[in-house]
A protein has these predicted regions:
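Residues that mark the start of a beta-strand
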Residues: 5, 29-31, 145
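Extracytoplasmic/periplasmic beta-strand context in beta-sandwich domains
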Residues: 18, 85, 100-101
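Glycine-rich beta-strand-centered segment in the early N-terminal region that forms part
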Residues: 23-38, 52-93, 116
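Short Gly/aromatic-enriched secondary-structure transition segments
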Residues: 45-52
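NAD(P)H dinucleotide-binding glycine-rich loop of Rossmann-like/cofactor-binding domains
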Residues: 67, 90-149
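N-terminal Rossmann-fold NAD(P) dinucleotide-binding loop
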Residues: 155
Length: 155
């Protein structure tokens, strides 16, 4: 079986890089070759403080908690994605594994990117999902005074 590189958090504040097998696909899954991966604040919280359900699961799965990335479809068992397409892995900390060369992922966590697009710029679309989620949860703010705090890595 083919091998790949993958980061792996083996305990709090400890990440190693190791060779593991490229994941095999099951029905309706997509194999994505990671081209770009960003480090989200959530990743730091998981690794440095044990934040989220992952804390009790050390060592973490290969490639986790990386969940923000751009990649290329290498193999697909989904009718919605074809080999060669460039995709954005939708932020899902429990499904994505962008800190590995390859990840087998449910297509519901993938977004097709336009051909010949600037992948570095589109990587920032990950941030947009957080803004969209927050906007939907705060309700109507028309006529109210609000503060936006924490620009994060996009700031």
């Amino acid at each position: 079986m083919k091998k790949m590189r993958a980061a792996r958090a083996i305990k709090l504040k400890t990440i190693i890089c190791e060779e593991v097998e490229v994941p095999e696909l099951t029905d309706n899954m997509v194999l994505v070759k990671t081209k770009l991966a960003s480090i989200c604040g959530s990743d730091l919280h998981v690794v440095n403080m044990g934040y989220t359900a992952y804390a009790s699961d050390f060592p973490l799965p290969y490639g986790a908690p990386g969940h923000e990335g751009v990649g290329e479809v290498i193999e697909s068992r989904s009718p919605d994605f074809s080999i060669g397409e460039t995709v954005l892995t939708d932020p899902n900390i429990y499904s994505s594994k962008t800190f590995a060369d390859y990840q087998a992922i449910d297509p519901k966590y993938l977004v097709k990117l336009p051909k010949n697009s600037n992948e570095n710029k589109l990587m920032m679309a990950q941030q947009l999902a957080t803004v969209e989620y927050s906007s939907k949860s705060i309700g109507d703010i028309e006529g109210k005074t609000i503060a936006v705090i924490g620009q994060g890595s996009a700031g």
